[in-house]
């Protein structure tokens, strides 16, 4: 039977997520019973025909329980994958209905056909809507087929897994798999026993620390194990490169006449030094006097194999697992862990306090290779000084930001909590964020504000997968960056995008002056807390 538009309009992953929880609880009970059966068999000391028969029965029971545990484990992961797919479909349906809201002369019939009401819209708009509907239905068919295939394999006995209770994470992958969605990662982690989790954090922190969908406390613990190891390795690499650099430099310096060549190890030395600076700064920020700062969570620690790429990190001020409001700050050009994270965390501290520290966490997210900026020729920057002129970096960065946000949402959803997630992006960071929000899963991000934006890709707020009316922007009067990217594919400055609301700005302020403006900080805090930023609490307090 064909899947239709009228059916997928009502698709929602909530029932599948509930099924994952039910299956997880069943797996844990089955594993307890399997352990008890194995223990009972091991306790038998007698012999004889009756005892032999009993042991045979216990052995058969063990095999049966092992098989059931393996099958339930497969159902957990299959259902989590399907939940991700249904969420994709729900998002695509949202994009279709948002398109209709943007072009109200168009409508979608129960049969999925595009209808025209009122004045005749452009042909390109009708074609675009038809394509969106087609993609939504195609994704629904794909999800249904994939899930049915995995379910039939279990039902028909074609699914085979011979793991026993003696195996690590019986019936489940021992390590997270490449390509998992945050929903799948969360389901896998939720199905593991506490002993299995502790073993993974201890023995494989590199597989856990950056896994979107896991609790922040887990990621923080794993990354804090990794950080000193990565720093030590970076220092050793720098020492080795420095020795090679010095050796060649002695030869160059010894040339008595003629032009002296450039040291061939210069770039490698500078890159290795930047790597050490990144990790040293991060270690300083998340620790104090050799002790961990427990109100900071190290949620991302990505150390590229090659040193020509900067370390990526995300640090939360506050506990994202307990916070009902989680804001993510996305910086613009020139920001690296070594040069930008410290200032971002200072701002995050203030934003959290203004929004209500008891229920708020603020993340400083440097999860992409921010362009170094125009004319940056100093020796402390990776990347090209022309990267900021195109959207290529933003296109590459957007999926990582989406996964990060989705992971926070999913980890809260596992606790039965719908968090209020917001994005606060500056300069090129708004281009990254705007690109991400074009494709983010529906329901994840509740509001976003862009300040000092060269352009955030959309021409109408309906194009971002954020509730309409919850997109904001601030533009200082002497900011020369605002709107400068429109001709380069960045899109118009957000203040010119229908559906975007303006918040406080400074008519005399420059590009990077926003957070020092108390009124802007107040508006950002209200957005973070899910309040209306048009209500000026500073002025109201002054009038009391």
Go through the PLM ranges and name each one:
Residues 424-433:
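Gly/Ala-rich beta-loop-alpha elbow adjacent to hydrolase catalytic centers
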Residues 39, 315, 434-435:
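Contiguous, well-ordered alpha-helical segments that form the cores/surfaces of helical PPI scaffolds
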Residues 60, 71, 309, 343, ...:
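Short, glycine/acidic-rich beta->alpha junctions
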Residues 319-321, 332-419, 437-544:
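Lipolytic serine-hydrolase domain surface
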Residues 1-167, 396, 410:
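N-terminal secretion-targeting helices of virulence/extracellular proteins
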Residues 156-361, 373-385, 392, 409:
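Long, composition-driven intrinsically disordered regions
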Residues 133, 137-143, 428, 523-529:
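Short, Φ-rich (hydrophobic/aromatic) sequence segments
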Residues 103-107, 293-296, 360, 496-500:
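Short glycine-aromatic motifs
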């Amino acid at each position: 039977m064909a899947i239709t538009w009228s059916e997928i309009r009502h698709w929602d992953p909530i029932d599948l997520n509930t099924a994952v929880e039910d299956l997880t609880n069943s797996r844990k009970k089955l594993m307890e019973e399997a352990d008890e059966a194995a223990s009972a068999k091991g306790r038998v000391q007698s012999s004889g025909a009756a005892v032999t028969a009993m042991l045979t029965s216990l052995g058969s029971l063990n095999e049966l329980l092992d098989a059931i545990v393996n099958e339930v484990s497969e159902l957990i992961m299959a259902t989590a994958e399907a939940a991700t797919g249904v969420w994709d479909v729900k998002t695509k349906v949202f994009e279709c209905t948002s398109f209709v809201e943007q072009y109200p002369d168009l409508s979608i019939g129960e049969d999925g056909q595009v209808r025209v009401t009122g004045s005749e819209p452009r042909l390109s708009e009708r074609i675009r809507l038809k394509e969106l509907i087609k993609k939504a239905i195609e994704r629904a068919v794909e999800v249904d087929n994939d899930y049915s295939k995995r379910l039939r394999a279990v039902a028909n006995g074609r699914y085979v897994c011979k793991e026993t209770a003696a195996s690590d994470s019986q019936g489940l992958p021992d390590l997270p798999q490449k390509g998992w969605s945050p929903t799948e990662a969360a389901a896998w982690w939720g199905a593991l026993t506490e002993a299995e989790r502790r073993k993974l954090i201890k023995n494989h922190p590199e597989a856990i620390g950056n896994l979107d969908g896991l609790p922040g406390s887990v990621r923080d613990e794993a990354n804090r194990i990794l950080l000193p190891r990565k720093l030590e390795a970076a220092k050793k690499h720098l020492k080795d490169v420095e020795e090679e650099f010095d050796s060649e430099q002695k030869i160059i310096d010894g040339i008595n006449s003629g032009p002296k060549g450039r040291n061939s190890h210069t770039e490698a030395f500078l890159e290795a030094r930047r790597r050490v600076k990144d990790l040293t700064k991060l270690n300083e920020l998340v620790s104090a006097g050799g002790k961990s700062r427990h109100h900071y969570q190290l949620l991302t620690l990505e150390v590229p194999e090659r040193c020509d790429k900067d370390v990526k990190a995300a640090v939360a001020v506050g506990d994202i697992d307990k916070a009902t409001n989680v804001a993510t700050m996305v910086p613009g050009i020139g920001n690296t862990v070594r040069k930008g994270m410290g200032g971002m965390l200072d701002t995050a501290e203030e934003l959290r306090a203004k929004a209500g520290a008891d229920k708020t966490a603020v993340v400083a997210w440097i999860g992409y290779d921010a362009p170094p900026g125009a004319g940056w020729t100093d020796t402390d920057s990776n990347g090209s000084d022309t990267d900021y002129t195109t959207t290529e970096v933003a296109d590459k960065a957007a999926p990582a930001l989406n996964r990060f946000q989705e992971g926070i949402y999913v980890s809260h959803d596992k606790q039965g909590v719908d968090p209020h997630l917001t994005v606060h992006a500056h300069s090129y960071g708004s281009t990254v964020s705007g690109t991400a929000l074009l494709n983010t899963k529906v329901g994840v991000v509740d509001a976003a504000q862009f300040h000092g934006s060269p352009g955030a890709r959309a021409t109408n707020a309906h194009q971002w997968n954020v509730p309409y009316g919850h997109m904001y922007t601030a533009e200082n009067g002497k900011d020369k960056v605002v709107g400068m990217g429109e001709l380069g594919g960045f899109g118009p400055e957000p203040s010119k995008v229908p559906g975007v609301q303006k918040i406080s700005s400074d008519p005399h302020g420059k590009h990077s002056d926003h957070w020092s403006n108390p009124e802007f900080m107040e508006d950002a805090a209200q957005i973070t807390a899910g309040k209306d930023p048009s209500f000026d609490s500073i002025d109201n307090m002054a009038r009391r």
